[in-house]
Amino acid sequence: MHKIAAAPPPSATPGGGLETPLAAPKYGTLIPNRIFVGGISGDTTEADLTRVFSAYGTVKSTKIIVDRAGVSKGYGFVTFETEQEAQRLQADGECVVLRDRKLNIAPAIKKQPNPLQSIVATNGAVYYTTTPPAPISNIPMDQFAAAVYPPAAGVPAIYPPSAMQYQPFYQYYSVPMNVPTIWPQNYQENHSPLLHSPTSNPHSPHSQSHPQSPCWSIEDLRDTLPRV
């Protein structure tokens, strides 16, 4: 089998009809019997890949990767019947052109998932979980606080929700107080001079003074007793 002559680099091709193909991933798990094909044009179909690569062996399946809208991402995979056919294409297919595009042939590698992607938000902000200090009072504190670190300027950051509002706690204290003595009303009327004001209305039935009972001394009582 004759090798296909190597084409000049895309930048040196007259007219600029060819474009730089996409590169295959560098790290991951090697998939046997399968090759990576980059640099596929948007109008290329899986049937076109089957027709081109059938010259290198028995093509078992072809797959062009598309996005959610169904638009081709520019690369795909071709699976052969045996591993020898896939390796022979990688050795002989130095320049495979399809629809005026040079295809990039490389081993098919399954990329390893990145554990850091699980903490990256859609806007590029990275979330970290921090532990608050130990509480110093009886008021409960938040268990976790979210800190947002934007990667660059101009990227909108997501702020955590407002902290929970706690009602203040008041403790009851019993303070002893000196309560003044309250005397009966009759005692105040008879002995308190403040109740008999000289400016009171004399015609008022409540302001008239009550007749006082006469006061007798011991000498007066002696005069009234019969002498023996």
Swiss-Prot record:
InterPro entries: DAZ_BOULE_RRM, DAZ_dom, Nucleotide-bd_a/b_plait_sf, RBD_domain_sf, RRM_dom. Residues 193-228 are annotated as: Disordered. GO terms for biological process: 3'-UTR-mediated mRNA stabilization; cell differentiation; G2/MI transition of meiotic cell cycle; positive regulation of translational initiation; regulation of female receptivity; regulation of translation; spermatocyte division. It is found in: Nucleus; Cytoplasm. It holds the Pfam family RRM_1. Residues 151-178 form the DAZ domain. This is Protein boule. Interacts with the translational regulator orb2. Residues 219-228 have a biased composition (Basic and acidic residues). Belongs to the RRM DAZ family. GO terms for molecular function: mRNA 3'-UTR binding; mRNA binding; RNA binding; translation activator activity. It comes from the Eukaryota. GO terms for cellular component: cytoplasm; nucleus; perikaryon. Its main location: nucleus. It comes from Drosophila melanogaster. Transmembrane segments: none annotated. Testis specific. RNA-binding protein that plays a central role in spermatogenesis. Required for meiotic entry and germline differentiation, at the transition between G2 and M phases of meiosis I. Acts by regulating translation of specific mRNAs, possibly by binding to their 3'-UTR. Essential for translation of twine (twe) mRNA. Required for the expression of various genes such as CG6784, CG17210, CG15841 scpr-B, scpr-C, and rho-6. Residues 33-110 form the RRM domain. Residues 193-214 have a biased composition (Low complexity). Keywords: Activator, Cytoplasm, Developmental protein, Differentiation, Nucleus, RNA-binding, Spermatogenesis, Translation regulation. PROSITE patterns: DAZ (PS51890), RRM (PS50102).
